[in-house]
Structures are given as C-alpha cells and as structure tokens.
C-alpha cells in the first residue's frame, strides 16, 4: 500500500534528494567539468541528466562509469531495480556556465598559476563566449598572512530585482592551497536570447527595442490622381431669432 504524504513533505523530500545528488556528483565528477544535474520523474522511471563539459569521461570506457554511478545512486536512494537511468549531456556553451568556469579557475589555482592571471584568463573567456557581463571574486590568504579579497569585473551586471533570478548564473567553490583555503565566486550575466538556448527568452524590463521603419517605394514615373469631389453638404436650418416684446 502506497504511503500518502503531504505536498509540503514531498517538496522538501524532492529538494533534499536533488541537493544530496548534486553534492555527490560534484565530488565524483569535479575533474570532468560537472556543471549541474536535472531530474525528470516519469510514471515508470526517474531520469537523471548530468550536465558536463567532458561527457566522454562521465560515460567512461564502454559506458562503464555511468553504469557504476547508476548503481550507486540506485542503492543510496532506494530506487527499485531498473527504475533509474543516468544520462550525460554536454554543456552547450561552456563560457556561459558559472559552475564550469569556477571549476576551471579552481584547477588553474591548484596548478600554481598566479591569482590575477588566472582570473583575467577566465574573465576573457567568459566575455568572448557572448556573456553580457561577469564578476569573479577570490578571497582568502592571497599574499601574506592577512586575508583579503580581489574582485575582477567586466561588462554589465545586475544585482537586484526579479531578472537576477534568470539572468545571473552564480557558482561558489573552495580551493585548498598551501597557505590556506581560498573562496571563489563566479557570476555571469547571460545575454537575452529569443530562442532560449544560451540565455533567457524574456528581455530585461528596461530593454527598449526600436522597430526599423519600412522602406518607402519611391515612384520612378510621375503619376496623377483624380480625386472625387466632395458632395455638397446640406446647410443646417437657421435657428429662429427671439422676438423682442414691448
């Protein structure tokens, strides 16, 4: 007999499942450019789509790794046999994915690249990918014992209002270096895209689109038009004048 749970509890349970799944995949697929996960529930099975920049590494040799991940997810979350399927999907535009860029910056810093040089490299790549703006903040023991933060900004960035929810992609990562832990925060402002592929379909509220005027057809030969004469309008009857009384 199926146990009935309230809508509130179901939303909470779904949120916990997605958060735990995201944390597990972030740890497991960090080196493969993991960029997020989508969960689609159908009446017969649950489909989990893993978004990554290097999908071949996620799949593994002859699909071995994806089968191992499927078995782990099935066992950990108590799915019945064969009711869960994992798919790997390539991120369309790597430069517009904040998680992918935060991971890229993390590995650059782990490789010993200078903070300023690594951040400017990421900033340039994001802007070349077609972003409207971006912001990279690195904080921690950058030089010496005193902690400080460095902010690198380019282009346009909105910070308030409802459009932030669908125009700004944000990611936070931590990297452990010899001098301590550094925090990385990447914010990317996506461009407006009417097709909805690389950015939101809905334009910004202050966006003004100017319609191009239609081209007028210039007559090449002189023409004359005979306009019909207006019919005579009937005159309104004269108002009777008041008669003065003695």
Swiss-Prot record:
Domain of life, source organism: Eukaryota
Catalytic class of the enzyme: lyase
UniProt record similarity statement: Belongs to the universal ribosomal protein uS3 family.
PANTHER family for the chain: 30S/40S RIBOSOMAL PROTEIN S3, SMALL RIBOSOMAL SUBUNIT PROTEIN US3
Name of the gene encoding the protein in the UniProt record: rps3-a
Compartment annotation: Cytoplasm; Nucleus; Nucleus, Nucleolus; Mitochondrion inner membrane
PROSITE patterns membership: KH_TYPE_2 (PS50823), RIBOSOMAL_S3 (PS00548)
Entry-linked Pfam families: KH_2 (PF07650), Ribosomal_S3_C (PF00189)
Any one GO biological process: cell division
NCBIfam families: PRK04191.1, uS3_euk_arch
Known role: Component of the small ribosomal subunit. The ribosome is a large ribonucleoprotein complex responsible for the synthesis of proteins in the cell. Has endonuclease activity and plays a role in repair of damaged DNA. Also involved in other processes including regulation of transcription, translation of its cognate mRNA, spindle formation and chromosome movement during mitosis, and apoptosis.
Keywords recorded for this protein, A-Z: Apoptosis, Cell cycle, Cell division, Cytoplasm, Cytoskeleton, DNA damage, DNA repair, DNA-binding, Lyase, Membrane, Mitochondrion, Mitochondrion inner membrane, Mitosis, Nucleus, Ribonucleoprotein, Ribosomal protein, RNA-binding, Transcription, Transcription regulation, Translation regulation
GO cellular component: cytosolic small ribosomal subunit; mitochondrial inner membrane; nucleolus; nucleus; spindle
Protein name as annotated: Small ribosomal subunit protein uS3A
InterPro entries: KH_dom-like_a/b, KH_dom_type_2, KH_sf_prok-type, Ribosomal_S3_C_sf, Ribosomal_uS3_C, Ribosomal_uS3_CS, Ribosomal_uS3_euk/arc
Membrane topology: Peripheral membrane protein
GO molecular-function terms, A-Z: class I DNA-(apurinic or apyrimidinic site) endonuclease activity; DNA binding; RNA binding; structural constituent of ribosome
Domain KH type-2: start-end pairs: 21-92
């Amino acid at each position: 007999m199926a146990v009935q749970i309230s809508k509130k509890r179901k939303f909470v349970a779904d949120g916990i499942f997605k958060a735990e799944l995201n944390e597990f995949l972030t740890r497991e697929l960090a080196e493969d450019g993991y960029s997020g996960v989508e969960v689609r529930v159908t009446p017969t099975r649950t489909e989990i789509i893993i978004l990554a920049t290097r999908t071949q590494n996620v799949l593994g040799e002859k699909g071995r790794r994806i089968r191992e991940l499927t078995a782990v997810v099935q066992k950990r979350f108590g799915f019945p046999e064969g009711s869960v399927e994992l798919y790997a999907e390539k991120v369309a535009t790597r430069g517009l994915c904040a998680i992918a860029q935060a991971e890229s910056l993390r590995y650059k810093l782990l490789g010993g690249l200078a903070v300023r040089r690594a951040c400017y490299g990421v900033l340039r790549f994001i802007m070349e990918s077609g972003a409207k703006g971006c912001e990279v903040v690195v904080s921690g023991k950058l030089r010496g014992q005193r902690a400080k933060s460095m902010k690198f900004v380019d282009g346009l960035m909105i910070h308030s209002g409802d459009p932030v929810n669908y125009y700004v992609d944000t990611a936070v990562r931590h990297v452990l270096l010899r001098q301590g832990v550094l925090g990385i925060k990447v914010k990317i402002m996506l461009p407006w895209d009417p097709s909805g592929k690389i950015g939101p379909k809905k334009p910004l509220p202050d966006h003004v689109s100017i319609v191009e005027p239609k081209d007028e057809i210039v007559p090449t030969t002189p023409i004359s038009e005979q306009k019909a004469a207006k019919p005579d309008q009937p005159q309104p009857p004269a108002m009777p004048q008041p008669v003065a009384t003695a």
